[in-house]
Structures are given as structure tokens and as C-alpha cells.
């Protein structure tokens, strides 16, 4: 079946292996992941657009090995997606209603974009009847088997919710009373999007989540924990300004605004554009785009957060001041640890000899 659709079995299994690892499953699950993907056309997906830039859809379209055309449309049965579907106007609205009715209680709903709510619903209307985005979201959510908010706009409101939030843009979770899994990012990795669908196919349940309803398998660790420049941070080697010698040598970007220590995501592990790169690799710090209200709380993007948001363990010193000392402190702690280990080893040997 794969060969008929122009997909090499080796490429497909390579993709399945990568998805298995990404979901933190043992390698023995790879054949099961592959089988789930092959059977995934039984799981209809409806994708709605709200107030957004379509960046999350752009990310999805860059899924690789197999690509979006062969994997998503052939195996996951994408029933409705305004960016890639041919229908428009009345026909598009008919297709949506048909999918909701035909797959009632069985489809996965994915929503991209913040949603003007309350008395401001009219700021976003969709389709030939001028239905508000909030009405569309509530209607499609009612009979969904699982609901995913794709991107930070749908998860937390997005940049259109920035103060003073003139359109009262809200996350999907505040528009529907159904459980919502948030997949934030601006945009999220295509593998974080597809991985959640595969998790649902494999286990028939939603993934475990953190306090902000983000899947733990994707958002369980900080950018800082997985960053390839973490060693530079620990050594106290920082870029002082863009273009300086430290920037050329790949030093830590914390002092020029990187929000990696405060941001939970797996960008450094998965990267973007078919695993090509990610912001820190390209020379710019993380802006914290998978965190709630990052548009208001993480700026200015080229300056450290310091002590404005987060208390530290350093007697009130801002994180930017701490960065000056952290390298020396950690190196000293490491030296103490090495010495302690040596003493302990000698004691154990003496005990064994006696």
C-alpha cells in the first residue's frame, strides 16, 4: 500500500521510529506506531482557523518522511482545513457540517488561532452566513472525540490578546466547556502536532499534561535543559551583544534576551523546517513563545527577564546578574564535588582492604 502511494518503506519506518522516540515510547513500539499511522485514515480530523497568521498550518505542511500530502491526507483523513481544501464559501461550509455529522463523536478537532469572545465575538466571522468564530468553535467542539488547541493563539489567546486586548481574544479552552489539550508555540513543531494525533490513535486517550494542559512528552523539559549552548551558560560564556566575538563562537544568548530558562518546549530537540534549525541555532534567543502571555511577560525580547517575573534562589539578584556569577559558582561546585567523590572513593577502598 505504501509503495502504491510512492512512499518508501524505509522512509516510513524511519519516520515512525522518530515519532516513537518523540513520544518517549520504547523502540519496540515503532512497528505499532507505523501500523497506527497506516490505519489512521479511520480517524477523521477537522481543522478550524480563527484569529491567526496560519503559521501553525505552515508548520504542519512541512512534516517530512513521509510528507504532508502522503501521510496526513492519506492516513489521517483531514476532512476540513480551509488553507489546503479546494472548496470555498457555501461548499466549504457544507463540507464542514457534513464531516461533523458523519463522524459525530469520532473526529479529532484541531483549532488554530485565538477567538474573540463575549460581546466582542463579532470581531471574527466565518463563512457565508457570517457565523462568529466562537460559534464555530463551540459547534465543532460539541461532538469531537478529542480537541487540540494548535499554537499559542488557540492555547493562550495569542499576540492579539496582548494588552489591552481590544478584541477580547481568548484561548479555545475559555470558549468551549470540553477538555482541551494545548499544543503551544509560535508555531509549534510539526512533530508536536502530528505526535498528539498518533498518541490518540495508539492509546485511545489524551496524553498526560502539565499545569497548562500541555502534553508532557513535548513540554516536560525547559528549552534550557536541552539547549546545545547550555555548556556555555554553565561556563559563564555569554554573548554581550549581537555580532560580537561571543556570538561568532556560539556563546549563550541569555544576556541578549534568551528566555530558554523559563520556557518549556522541545524545540532544540526537534527543530523546524524538517529538522533544519531553530532560533538559538540561528543566533537568536528563545522568546518564550510556548508560555502563557509571552507577548506581554517575556518582552523586550532582546533583554533578559531578570527578576521582573521569577524569584531566584540568589537573594533577590536578577537572573541577569546571576548569569555573571553562575559559571564561577558552578565550576566551584563541580570542583567540590570531584574532591568529595575522590575522598569517598578512598574511604570505600580502605574499607574493602580492611
From Swiss-Prot:
Task: Locate the residues binding [4Fe-4S] cluster 1.
Answer: 53, 56, 153, 186
**UniProtKB keywords:** 3Fe-4S, 4Fe-4S, Cell membrane, Iron, Iron-sulfur, Membrane, Metal-binding, Oxidoreductase, Signal
Signal peptide positions are 1-36
EC number(s) in its UniProt entry? 1.12.5.1
> How does the record classify its membrane topology?
Peripheral membrane protein
- The domain of life is Bacteria
What Gene Ontology cellular component terms go with this record? [Ni-Fe] hydrogenase complex; ferredoxin hydrogenase complex; plasma membrane
Q: Which InterPro entries does this chain map to? A: Cytochrome-c3_hydrogenase_C, NADH_UbQ_OxRdtase-like_20kDa, NiFe-Hase_small_C_sf, NiFe_Hase_small_N_sf, NiFe_hydrogenase_ssu, TAT_signal
Q: Supply the PROSITE patterns for this chain.
A: TAT
Tell where it localizes: Cell membrane
Q: Where does [3Fe-4S] cluster bind?
A: 267, 286, 289
Q: What is the UniProt remark on how the cofactor binds and its stoichiometry?
A: Binds 2 [4Fe-4S] clusters. Binds 1 [3Fe-4S] cluster.
Keyword 4Fe-4S applies: yes
Q: Which GO terms describe its molecular function?
A: 3 iron, 4 sulfur cluster binding; 4 iron, 4 sulfur cluster binding; electron transfer activity; ferredoxin hydrogenase activity; hydrogen:quinone oxidoreductase activity; metal ion binding
Some GO term, biological process aspect, for this entry: which one? anaerobic respiration
* Leading EC class: oxidoreductase
Q: Where do the annotations place [4Fe-4S] cluster 2 binding?
A: 224, 227, 252, 258
Coiled-coil region list? none
Q: Specify where it is mainly localized.
A: membrane
Question: Transport among the record's keywords?
Answer: no
Q: How is it modified after translation?
A: Predicted to be exported by the Tat system. The position of the signal peptide cleavage has been experimentally proven.
Name this protein carries in UniProt:
Quinone-reactive Ni/Fe-hydrogenase small chain
Q: Which organism is it from?
A: Wolinella succinogenes (strain ATCC 29543 / DSM 1740 / CCUG 13145 / JCM 31913 / LMG 7466 / NCTC 11488 / FDC 602W) (Vibrio succinogenes)
Q: Which gene encodes it?
A: hydA
Amino acid at each position: 500500500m505504501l509503495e502504491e502511494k510512492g512512499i518508501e518503506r524505509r522512509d516510513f519506518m524511519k519516520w515512525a521510529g522518530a515519532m516513537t522516540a518523540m513520544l518517549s515510547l520504547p523502540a519496540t513500539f515503532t512497528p505499532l506506531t507505523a501500523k497506527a499511522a497506516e490505519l489512521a485514515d479511520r480517524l477523521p480530523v477537522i481543522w478550524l482557523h480563527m484569529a491567526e497568521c496560519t503559521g501553525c498550518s505552515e508548520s504542519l505542511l512541512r512534516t517530512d518522511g513521509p510528507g504532508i500530502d502522503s501521510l496526513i491526507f492519506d492516513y489521517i483523513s483531514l476532512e476540513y482545513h480551509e488553507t489546503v481544501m479546494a472548496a470555498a464559501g457555501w461548499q466549504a461550509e457544507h463540507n464542514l457540517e457534513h464531516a461533523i455529522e458523519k463522524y459525530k463523536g469520532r473526529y479529532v478537532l484541531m483549532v488554530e488561532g485565538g477567538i474573540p469572545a463575549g460581546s466582542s465575538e463579532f470581531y471574527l466571522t466565518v463563512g457565508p452566513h457570517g457565523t462568529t468564530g466562537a460559534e464555530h468553535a463551540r459547534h465543532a467542539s460539541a461532538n469531537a472525540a478529542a480537541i487540540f488547541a494548535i499554537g499559542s493563539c488557540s492555547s493562550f489567546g495569542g499576540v492579539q490578546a496582548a494588552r489591552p486586548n481590544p478584541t477580547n481574544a481568548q484561548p479555545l479552552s475559555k470558549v468551549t466547556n470540553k477538555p482541551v489539550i494545548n499544543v503551544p508555540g509560535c508555531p509549534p513543531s510539526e512533530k508536536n502536532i502530528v505526535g498528539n494525533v498518533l498518541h490518540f490513535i495508539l492509546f485511545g486517550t489524551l496524553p498526560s499534561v502539565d499545569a497548562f494542559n500541555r502534553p508532557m512528552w513535548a513540554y516536560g523539559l525547559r528549552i534550557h535543559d536541552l539547549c546545545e549552548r547550555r555548556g556555555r551558560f554553565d561556563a559563564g560564556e555569554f554573548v554581550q551583544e549581537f555580532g560580537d566575538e561571543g556570538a561568532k563562537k556560539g556563546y549563550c544568548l541569555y544576556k541578549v534576551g534568551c528566555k530558554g530558562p523559563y520556557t518549556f518546549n522541545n524545540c532544540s530537540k526537534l527543530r523546524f523546517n524538517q529538522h533544519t534549525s531553530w532560533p538559538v541555532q540561528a543566533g537568536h534567543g528563545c522568546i518564550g513563545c510556548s508560555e502563557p502571555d509571552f507577548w506581554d511577560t517575556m518582552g523586550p525580547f532582546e533583554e533578559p527577564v531578570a527578576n521582573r517575573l521569577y524569584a531566584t534562589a540568589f537573594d533577590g539578584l536578577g537572573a541577569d546578574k546571576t548569569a555573571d556569577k553562575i559559571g564561577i559558582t558552578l565550576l566551584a561546585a563541580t570542583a567540590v564535588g570531584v574532591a568529595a567523590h575522590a575522598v569517598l572513593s578512598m574511604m570505600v577502598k580502605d574499607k574493602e582492604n580492611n
